[in-house]
Regions:
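Non-catalytic accessory segments flanking enzymatic or RNA/DNA-binding domains
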Residues: 1-277
Length: 277
């Protein structure tokens, strides 16, 4: 039976690699298939409730993408080193949750190049490919290094971003497809320019800790978009709790409507009413 309406706490969009990416919206206990709603009128209404995605308590404000303030201050997944992995302090025995750190940070990470709104460098756990690329709305992506820990991947990223961006311009992302980039050539250029720095990191952590991926292939990703927005305007459910319009596309964590665009991940843990007409 086709989805008509529902209400619940939301999580980030789930995107499965396909031609194009196949999206769904976690809404309470259900997952709303989104691709089939392209061209339909959808309505999202913030119901004035936010429940922490970790402990479930009600909170007036969302911290660290869906947490309450107490959880934000105590969870390792909300620490500053998640945003700045080179600042990892696990080896100082000050990790908020050492067991969590063992599982999520002391594991193989991939340093990659992507083309979203232009060339950028990024990192992710090896198990999060291609999810990370889809979440960022990348049209092309290429793994370039396999690194032993999150901290080490952050140090490599810090080295490479001296010559390439590490951020995505969301407006450019939603205005259209980026011009294709020769990611293999960019990989060779960037790694060549960072050779001395990479060798220093290998000397510090061991040769096997930072390994190039010369045989990796470029992944092309296509998104379900009927029409891009020439001048994307971002919806703010905090100020205007109702957003309604024709769904024209889905890219990264954004829904593109003819009235505005909305970053769904920004509203993680918000209770929304979602309907289709």
């Amino acid at each position: 039976m086709a989805f008509v309406s529902g209400e619940g706490s939301i999580r980030k969009l789930l995107g499965a690699l396909d031609e194009p990416v196949n999206y769904s919206l976690p809404l309470g206990e259900q997952q709303v298939p989104l691709n089939e709603l392209l061209g339909r009128t959808i309505r999202l209404q913030a119901m004035g409730e936010i429940h922490c995605m970790h402990c479930g308590r009600r909170t007036k404000k969302s911290y660290s993408q869906g947490h309450c303030y107490p959880c934000m201050t105590k969870l390792a997944s909300c620490d500053v080193c998640i945003v700045s992995p080179e600042r990892c302090h696990y080896e100082l025995n000050t990790c908020r949750e050492p067991a969590w750190g063992e599982q999520f940070c002391m594991t193989d990470h991939i340093v990659y190049l992507a083309n979203s709104s232009g060339l950028k460098v990024g990192i992710t756990r090896a198990t999060q490919i291609p999810t990370r690329w889809i979440d960022q709305g990348a049209s092309q992506a290429l793994p370039i290094l396999r690194v032993a820990t999150r901290q080490q991947s952050g140090l490599v990223e810090d080295l490479l971003r001296q010559n390439v961006a590490d951020k995505t311009n969301w407006r450019a992302l939603l205005r259209g497809e980026p011009e294709p980039i020769d990611l293999l050539a960019e990989r060779d250029r960037l790694l060549g320019g960072a050779r001395e720095g990479l060798e220093a990191l290998q000397a510090r952590f061991g040769l096997q800790a930072i390994q190039p991926l010369p045989d990796a292939q470029v992944q092309d990703i296509r998104y379900p978009v009927l029409q891009y927005s020439a001048k994307p305007q971002s919806a703010n459910l905090g100020k205007e709790p109702v957003l309604e319009g024709t769904l024209l596309g889905i890219k990264g964590q954004y829904l593109l409507l003819d009235t505005a665009v909305i970053n769904i991940r920004k509203y993680t843990s918000y209770t929304l009413a979602f309907s289709v007409s």
